[in-house]
Amino acid sequence: MTDQVNRPKGVTSVALIAHDNKKADLIAWVEKNSVKLNKCTVYATGTTGKLIAEKTGVDVKRCHSGPLGGDQQIGALISEGKVDLLIFFWDPLEPMPHDPDIKALLRLATLWNVPSACNSATADFLVNSNLFEEFLPQRPDFDSYLSRDVPGN
């Protein structure tokens, strides 16, 4: 099913995203988990990353703001194998103008087998799991998909 990625064990990169009404929750979660996160490359969308860096001291590689393409940039990092874990505190009570981007991001995380959390409880399970230190990404093998016969060609 998958190819194991040849690299050291453990989560080495985390992407952090939060909608406006969830930014305070994510910042609190990052403060609580800063020791582990400081051992990782941390990516974040623009405003979220700025606030995390200012309020927690965690070093963040910032993408654009989510609605300006940041969700898509994180998705690209996922497809390139540069993100091991996605923490995305999204607001289920607010419609977002960039909902298609959000759906695409979550689709890529699922497609590329990237563990994901949408709230602090699930995020806690992921970072406190023994697998956090032992994690080896397993990327799906899409060879059969890429070599399939396409009708009309």
From Swiss-Prot:
PROSITE patterns: METHYLGLYOXAL_SYNTH (PS01335), MGS (PS51855)
Binding residue positions for substrate: 19, 23, 45-48, 65-66, 98
GO molecular function, one term: methylglyoxal synthase activity
Lyase listed as a keyword: yes
GO BP, sorted A to Z: methylglyoxal biosynthetic process
Keywords: Lyase
Active site: 71 (proton donor/acceptor)
Keyword Lyase tagged: yes
One Pfam family named in its UniProt record: MGS
Any one of the GO CC terms: cytosol
Residues covered by the MGS-like domain: 3-153
Enzyme Commission no: 4.2.3.3
Reaction(s) catalysed (UniProt annotation): dihydroxyacetone phosphate = methylglyoxal + phosphate
Function summary: Catalyzes the formation of methylglyoxal from dihydroxyacetone phosphate.
Protein family: Belongs to the methylglyoxal synthase family.
HAMAP family, A to Z: Methylglyoxal_synth
Protein name: Methylglyoxal synthase
Organism encoding this protein: Hahella chejuensis (strain KCTC 2396)
